[in-house]
Design a protein with these regions (language model features):
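PLP-dependent amino-acid enzyme catalytic core
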Residues: 1-456
Length: 456
């Protein structure tokens, strides 16, 4: 294979190309988003069958860094990196699990869940962060002055950044909206010794502040406006096809917050088809919480986007009113005739409890995706016989406090406005799904009296 080139170009089409050594990963001309552009002609000198064989062989290899689901596809991520640059915690190659009983409950016969919560820090964000932090290590080794790496976060990005920077021994800073994360999510950057800053604003406010801070003080920005994150995350699409025998599902359902994830998946599926690894691209369904659904509103209004103020939602990573990657996401969805759906808080709660009831440790964001899937099946857009993969973006253990509070009724999840106002809706409130422990005396007759009626 010929040498592989990779560079930055402006997503908006400004003339010029820039190396990946750029510290401020915004277009130098317009200040907008950049894309990572690969030498697809060089990549195409290897056939689709040869790429499949290479990726399959690497999946079984113990030679570092091939056990990483990202770096086993290194030519498609960042071919400039040397082995000594790569910072990996063993991300990727997470399970993809058939869920027939849950699928039947949702109205589809062929449902699969891609368990991104099995990544090192418990979410899909690790796939992008390994690529970004590895590039920072390369730049610092080459003499670039990068004092630290920073991000704004609603939880999972901060966990990934802090862990990968700790592995690389690079200082990290995270800006968090005070009181908007689960206890478990807040614990992660603290325990990785990231400098953690809680601000009295929402995610959008944190994003504006961290971008300004980075540009003024030689700090490298790690949010998904940095396209290196997208390149790592796009390997998830390759994993899905690879784990399904190099077949592409009919639908992929992905939760949407800052919208880097759907952008990455679309890029990965498109490149696989272009290089001949697969013969089609899936249809994409982006799922948003109704309290924070700017992309859904744009979809319902001919893709005309307007920034909103996100309301409170248990799907905290979606509490974003001005997603950084919205223009990229809209372009990707328009290209594949994608769909956007929104779920109310009650629908979210019902969905994640359904996932739990069928054996998943379901986080609220996956609950949003399951609720959106149900609504699109009921609308007739997703057909019962079609194969559907739902991206479970994070592990339910990150939300143990929320789940425990729901079941113990100490602090139930937010209720939708319709539920609060409608007595009939209150009767169907998902709090009826709670499963508190039974407190019983330590006597067999009392235990039998309580349990035997439940076994009939």
């Amino acid at each position: 294979m010929t040498a592989l080139r990779v560079l930055f170009r402006c997503f908006e089409g400004c003339p010029g190309e820039w190396p990946l050594s750029l510290i401020d990963t915004r277009c130098p001309r317009c200040g907008g988003l950049l894309d990572v552009v690969h030498d697809e002609e060089a990549l195409a000198t290897r056939s689709g069958a040869a790429w499949r064989a290479l990726f399959d062989a690497r999946r079984l290899s113990a030679q570092w860094p091939m056990p990483s689901g990202v770096w086993s596809k290194r030519e498609w991520v960042n071919p400039e990196l040397d082995d000594e640059d790569i910072i990996s915690l063993g991300e990727g190659f997470t399970p993809i699990v058939p869920m027939p009983t849950l699928g039947r409950a949702l109205g589809v016969a062929n449902l699969w869940i891609k368990q991104c919560g099995h990544n090192p820090t418990g979410s899909f964000k690790d796939l992008g962060m390994t690529g970004l932090v590895s590039q920072v290590v390369r730049l610092r080794r080459q003499g670039a002055h990068i004092a630290a790496v920073a991000c704004a976060s609603t939880g999972d990005t901060s966990a990934a950044l802090s862990a990968y920077c700790a592995r690389a021994q690079v200082p990290s800073i995270v800006f968090l909206p005070a009181g908007k994360l689960s206890d478990e999510q807040l614990t992660q950057p603290i325990c990785s010794y990231s400098q953690t800053v809680a601000l009295d604003t929402d995610f959008d406010g944190c994003m504006a502040l961290v971008a300004a801070f980075c540009s003024r003080h030689g700090v490298y920005l790690a949010n998904s406006m940095n396209p290196l994150r997208i390149e790592g995350q796009k390997t998830l699409s390759i994993e899905i096809a690879q784990q399904l025998g190099w077949q592409v599902p009919d639908w992929v359902v992905v939760p949407g917050g800052n919208l880097g994830h759907v952008t990455a998946l679309a890029r990965g599926f498109a490149l696989q088809k272009k290089l001949g690894l697969t013969d089609k691209e899936p249809k994409l369904l982006v799922a948003q919480a109704a309290q924070a659904a700017p992309l859904y509103r744009a979809y319902r209004h001919s893709w005309q986007f307007q920034q909103t103020v996100a309301g409170p939602t248990q799907a905290t990573a979606m509490a974003i009113g001005n997603p950084v990657n919205v223009r990229k996401a809209i372009a990707a969805l328009q290209r594949v005739d994608g769909v956007v759906e929104a779920a109310t808080e009650d629908e979210i709660t019902r969905a994640w409890t359904a996932g739990d009831r069928h054996g998943l440790a379901t986080d609220p964001h996956t609950g949003v995706a399951l609720a959106a899937l149900r609504k699109q099946v009921e609308a007739g857009r997703i057909l019962p016989h079609e194969q559907v993969v739902v991206i479970s973006t994070a592990h339910g253990l990150k939300f143990g406090t929320l789940k425990r509070a729901f079941h113990l009724m100490t602090d139930p999840p937010l209720a939708s406005a319709t539920t609060q106002a409608d007595p009939a809706a209150q009767a169907a409130n998902p709090t009826t799904l709670r499963n508190p422990p039974l407190r019983l005396p330590a006597h067999l007759p009392a235990i039998e009296d309580a349990l035997l009626p439940k076994l009939t």
